[in-house]
């Protein structure tokens, strides 16, 4: 039975629930990702984009359960090292370490492009996922409201073909740049897209 969707701050308590949502949505997004690493990769991904204390990170709850989340921060914040420290204790052997370094280089490279293209007073939409229809829209509306209240005038994000980037077209974002992903991952020919939206 569907209940009312409530929006709250995202906190460390919800990292594992968010990782489970990410795994559910993107488990097969990257062909070539070792099956045995998928759970750990998405647990890492959520930690990579979680910036403790950011007022721009949100969660959507329904009947007491996480149904969507949005991690955001001022674009001037490049992130923290807590995810790498966490992952260091999760890897088993050389093969896993090699794949992880390739994966990390891929997201680091795209995050760096987002950082370099960011404007003054811009917020980064870092990671966004929903398993409940309508919850994502509510999160995005609250995110935009919080961006304005914290002096942000626009939002930037990066995405690629493994995501539903048409969603951003449908919600008022415009394509700011696109280029071949460098480095790429698993020999995929991916394109990195940067999207931007004014929230003035």
Can you annotate each of these PLM segments?
Residues 133-145, 170:
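Conserved acetyl-CoA-binding loop-helix of GNAT-fold acetyltransferases
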Residues 153-165, 181-200:
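C-terminal "cap" of GNAT-fold acetyltransferases
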Residues 4-20, 31:
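A short beta-loop-alpha structural element at the N-terminal edge
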Residues 76-127, 131, 185-187:
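Conserved acyl-donor/pantetheine-binding loop and adjacent beta-alpha core of acyl/acetyltransferases
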Residues 119-124, 147-160:
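Conserved GNAT acetyl-CoA-binding A-motif
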Residues 20-36:
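Helix-loop element at the rim of GNAT/NAT acetyltransferase active sites that forms part
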Residues 35-57, 61-63, 67, 71:
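Active-site rim helix/loop that mediates acceptor-substrate recognition in acyltransferases
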Residues 3-5, 64-69, 123:
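Glycine-rich phosphate/pyrophosphate-binding loop shared by adenosine-nucleotide-utilizing enzymes
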């Amino acid at each position: 039975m569907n209940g009312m969707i409530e929006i709250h701050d995202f906190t460390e308590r919800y990292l594992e629930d968010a990782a489970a949502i990410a795994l559910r949505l993107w488990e097969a997004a990257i062909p070539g990702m070792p099956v045995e690493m998928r759970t750990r990769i998405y647990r890492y991904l959520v930690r990579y984009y979680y910036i403790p204390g950011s007022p721009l990170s949100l969660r959507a709850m329904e009947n007491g359960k996480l149904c969507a989340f949005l991690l955001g921060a001022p674009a001037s914040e490049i992130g923290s090292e807590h995810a790498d420290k966490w992952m260091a204790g999760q890897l088993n052997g050389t093969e896993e370490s090699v794949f992880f370094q390739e994966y990390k280089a891929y997201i680091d490279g795209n995050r760096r492009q987002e950082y370099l293209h960011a404007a003054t007073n811009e917020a980064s939409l870092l990671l966004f996922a929903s398993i409940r229809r309508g919850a994502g829209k509510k999160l995005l509306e609250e995110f935009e409201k919080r961006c304005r209240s914290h002096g942000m005038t626009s939002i930037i994000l990066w995405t690629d073909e493994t995501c539903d980037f048409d969603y951003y077209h449908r919600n008022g974002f415009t394509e700011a740049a696109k280029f071949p992903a460098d480095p790429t991952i698993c020999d995929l020919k991916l394109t990195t897209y940067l999207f931007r939206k004014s929230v003035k």
